[in-house]
Amino acid sequence: MVATSEPKIAVKAQYVKDLSFENPDPINSLFKITEKPKIDTKLDINITKLSEDNHFEVELSTNVSATCNDKKIFHIEVVYAGIFQLTNISEEDKKFILSVRCPEIIFPYVRQIISESTQKGGFLPLMIDYIDFAEIISNTQTTNNPQKSIKPEFDVSNKQ
């Protein structure tokens, strides 16, 4: 077998680190709300180099709040992570892969968890729009010092 030097991304694990669903006033929020609620979504990416060679944990921390007339209807917090092994990838490319490609791989799972959680909470399933991580990182780097961090906080409010 010949050793290859081709770039490779391997997903070693995916998991929920934290999941919380709050429905502070279910009687009123499920039966007495007549207006469409305002949905606010915040997303944070955390990247941690693990002790194993070329292994990284990429974590998406998502908070979704629904309010109507300044009253909280529900709040969801999901922290979902993946362990990725990057092989034969330059340091410059690693930053892009870890802050864009890896979040793109795990985001659909976060979206599904949010949808299922709202539905199990008695609401219609909330489908978060697709997120263009490359555009967000590009915008963050043009407004901030790109050397500072690859851990920006994003406002990706749903436009429903």
From Swiss-Prot:
NCBIfam families: PRK05751.1-3, secB. GO terms for molecular function: unfolded protein binding. This is Protein-export protein SecB. One of the proteins required for the normal export of preproteins out of the cell cytoplasm. It is a molecular chaperone that binds to a subset of precursor proteins, maintaining them in a translocation-competent state. It also specifically binds to its receptor SecA. Gene3D superfamilies: SecB-like. Homotetramer, a dimer of dimers. One homotetramer interacts with 1 SecA dimer. It holds the Pfam family SecB. Keywords: Chaperone, Cytoplasm, Protein transport, Translocation, Transport. Belongs to the SecB family. It is found in: Cytoplasm. The gene is secB. GO terms for cellular component: cytoplasm. One of its GO terms (biological process) is protein tetramerization.
